Amino acid sequence: MITSAHIDDIRTQVRAWRAKGETVAFVPTMGNLHQGHITLVKEAAKKCDHVVASIFVNPMQFGQNEDLDAYPRTLEADSQALTAAGAELLFTPTPAIIYPKGLAQQTYVEVPGISDVLCGASRPGHFRGVATIVCKLFNIVQPDIAFFGNKDYQQLLVIRTMVEDLSLPIEIIGIDTIREASGLAMSSRNGYLTAQEKAAAPALKKAIDAMAQGIKQGISIEQVTEEAKASLTAAGFTPDYLEVRHADTLAKAETQDKALVILAAAYLGKARLIDNLRFDR
């Protein structure tokens, strides 16, 4: 696998592949990779001739008092895992390469509406940072297809909307959430959990599953939500949000809506865990 921090190196290699009529897939990451990321790379390798990955801990998407400095950097292990999964080109830029004028002077991309709710409300500016870095990476790599995990459901919709609104010629594919045996969604932030917290963490998935089951049985959204919040609190969580939304627009769920998604974010110790479940009523 070729690894470079420089934009020109990435563009030169991708141009060489394109000159031969070959297709390019892209998997952007922040590193500290787990099996969910590796699954994205393997799926990408099935779809395209070449897979490009990136590792960049993006300062623009972290708010004040968030874990930018603490976020684990594990480049050597990540590089080995990406190579084994089939990636051929790895982009590892520094913040100075991505934002040479600094964050305050950086042109940014903002996806209105869908970026302002749920995680966007809890983490102001987060999705501006996500949309900006993903747009920049798309312009650098210029892939045919890009792969993202469904665990970050709102992020996936923000990126799909950006691609559609800006007429970017890139197919976006979401891959099902990869889970540990306990049901806990794999996340780079699971490493913040103590052993006791990790034992309690599957309660988040159980609460979401119970909500969906209740809604399918005709129980009101309000009732299932209150019961789920109570179960999470009893398990040691501090819920951030727990909501039922229209699966495609993230508008608040209406009685007539069939395609729904439950989205949850909750703190467990130092970790902020997110999860979701899309289902039809």
Curated annotation (Swiss-Prot):
Q: Where does this polypeptide localize?
A: Cytoplasm
Claim: Transmembrane is one of the keywords in the record: no
Active-site residues (renumbered): 37 (proton donor)
Pathway, per record: Cofactor biosynthesis; (R)-pantothenate biosynthesis; (R)-pantothenate from (R)-pantoate and beta-alanine: step 1/1
Q: Does the keyword DNA-binding apply?
A: no
Leader sequence residues: none
Per the annotation, which location comes first and is thus the protein's main one? cytoplasm
Query: Which NCBIfam families does this chain map to?
Result: cyt_tran_rel (TIGR00125), panC (TIGR00018)
Q: What else is known?
A: The reaction proceeds by a bi uni uni bi ping pong mechanism.
Please state what the protein is called. Answer: Pantothenate synthetase
**Species:** Shewanella oneidensis (strain ATCC 700550 / JCM 31522 / CIP 106686 / LMG 19005 / NCIMB 14063 / MR-1)
